[in-house]
Curated annotation (Swiss-Prot):
Organism of derivation: Polynucleobacter asymbioticus (strain DSM 18221 / CIP 109841 / QLW-P1DMWA-1)
UniProt entry keywords in alphabetical sequence: Ribonucleoprotein, Ribosomal protein
Record-level Gene Ontology MF annotations: structural constituent of ribosome
Biased composition (Gly residues): 1-10
Pfam families found in the cross-reference section: Ribosomal_L27
Gene for this chain: rpmA
GO CC term (a single one): cytosolic large ribosomal subunit
Protein name as it appears in the record: Large ribosomal subunit protein bL27
NCBIfam families: L27
Region Disordered, residue ranges: 1-22
Domain of life: Bacteria
Amino acid sequence: MAQKKGGGSTRNGRDSESKRLGVKVFGGEHINAGSIIIRQRGTRVHPGANVGIGKDHTLFALIDGQVEFGVKGALKKAQVSVLPRS
C-alpha cells in the first residue's frame, strides 16, 4: 500500500503579468520631449498644456520642461501639464 496519498493536481498556479502602470515622472521634475509621464487605463489623469495622449491613454511630454500636476474644470478632473523652462 502507498505510504503517502497521491499528489493530485491543482487548479491554481496562474497569474497575469503586471502592466507597470502609474506615474513615471512626478510634479516638479524635469522631463524631455517624448518621455512618458503616466501610464494608465482610461483617462484617470487628463492631458494639459504640452502633454500628448497615446491610444492606450499614456500621457507623454510634447516639449522639454517641468512637470506640473493640477485640477481643471468644475468637476475638478486631475490634469498634468509640462511648463517650458524659463
